[in-house]
């Protein structure tokens, strides 16, 4: 375990509309606003998402199990923002449901909004963190400097 203490900086309230590409739009805001460390919450709907539902086996590095989510899904999730060099890295876990059928997963790509998706981004000030590639684990891991 490792941790640092910081404070909440700027707060952004964002609305994505029907058909918007959510992850692409979020990356655009992060880059434009220069949000280097942050946390965000997501509430609304997605109609498309490519997600990882966990590892095939609990080993390091894990082999991800991919799933395509299609159709209207009520969505609630939370994620973090840290950078790997000049590239922001988003880590988002969300529950996506439809008529009682719910899937919880790591949302990775291909996200298209259904109706509306509301996002609140909290910038974290006062810490020096990044998300470089962690070869042993096979993923980008939060690291403090």
What spans do the regions from the language model cover?
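Short, structured patches in soluble enzyme cores that scaffold and shape functional sites
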Residues: 18, 44, 96-98, 121-125
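Generic N-terminal amphipathic, Lys/Arg-enriched alpha-helix
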Residues: 1-14
